[in-house]
């Protein structure tokens, strides 16, 4: 590992269709190309990230193979769920596949709690403890990868619900993908409020990695205005790299490939490479130990009397 510790990054935005899965897939590919060991986690019940790598969630279910749902319902370690791709990115990229029923995980856990409460007569405090433990199961599961991976990227569903909350509790960073749309930018206030509450209550180490603008058309005045608005609102947290609109995104998804595999010479691949480099630099700057303070230089002594006698100088009275 080239980082002091594994870094977990959540891609978060409750707005659907804002490029979360596309960004997650291609950022994972970019990190792997740069030589980092990466695990990509699919928490979206649509399973777009999972299918993008040619993994069929229905087939996994039919064959009884574990998915990320098992981290919640069975407390399975992520190391037992990982799917590897030895023939892609030198084996540096792995996947925790999603499950179509992931949006029912919270309800299933609540049903289990009610059953236990009836059978064992749990107190309200014990019920609260169970709910807290349920929200921390993803974090506990991912801990099994901490010594094996440089980065863990988590793709989340388009809502402020159980899955996103558990992801933010497990993360060091959150990255906000947005499209150049008023609807995308309007929803950021609620997301930042959610993050603030999680930081205050349970995860003080959670920090904003950046806001990345995608589907950008530089010839459109509105898109330029939205870019300026985001730059003004987020300042240095707004990513310098902007991902332009391109049919190559849809083509790569259809081919079940990252943009680096599908169109390595296209400007879109170059933009995701630039974004990867920018985000790595941000993480490295943050993790770098603070420089030691400069030693204080003692002031030169001042003398009110005659100059000091030089060594070896003979005094004449």
Segment roles from a protein language model:
Residues 1-317:
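P-loop NTP-binding core
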């Amino acid at each position: 590992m080239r980082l002091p510790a594994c870094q977990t990054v959540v891609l978060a935005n409750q707005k659907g269709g804002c490029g979360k899965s596309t960004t997650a897939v291609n950022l994972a590919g970019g990190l792997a190309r740069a030589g980092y060991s990466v695990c990509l986690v699919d928490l979206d019940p649509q399973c777009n990230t999972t299918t993008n790598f040619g993994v069929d969630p229905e087939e996994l279910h039919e064959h009884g193979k574990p998915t990320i749902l098992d981290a919640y319902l069975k407390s399975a370690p992520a190391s037992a769920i990982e799917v590897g791709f030895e023939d892609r990115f030198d084996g540096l990229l792995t996947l925790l596949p999603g499950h179509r029923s992931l949006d029912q995980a919270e309800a299933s856990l609540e049903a289990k709690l009610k059953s236990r409460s009836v059978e064992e007569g749990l107190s309200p405090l014990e019920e609260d403890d169970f709910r807290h433990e349920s929200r921390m199961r993803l974090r506990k599961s991912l801990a099994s990868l901490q010594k094996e991976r440089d980065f863990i990227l988590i793709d989340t569903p388009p809502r402020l619900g159980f899955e996103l909350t558990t992801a933010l509790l497990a993360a060091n960073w959150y990255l906000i993908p947005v499209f150049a749309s008023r609807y995308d930018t309007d929803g950021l206030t609620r997301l930042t409020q959610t993050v603030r509450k999680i930081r205050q209550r349970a995860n003080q180490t959670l920090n904003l990695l950046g806001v990345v603008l995608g589907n950008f058309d530089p010839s459109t005045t509105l898109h330029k205005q939205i870019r300026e608005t985001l730059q003004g609102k987020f300042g240095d947290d707004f990513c310098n790299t902007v991902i332009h609109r391109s049919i190559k995104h849809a083509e790569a998804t259809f081919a079940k490939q990252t943009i680096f595999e599908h169109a390595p010479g296209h400007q879109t691949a170059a933009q995701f490479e630039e974004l990867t480099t920018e985000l790595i630099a941000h993480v490295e700057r943050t993790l770098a130990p603070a420089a030691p303070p400069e030693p204080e230089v003692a002031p030169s002594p001042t003398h009110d009397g005659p100059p000091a006698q030089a060594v070896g100088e003979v005094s004449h009275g």
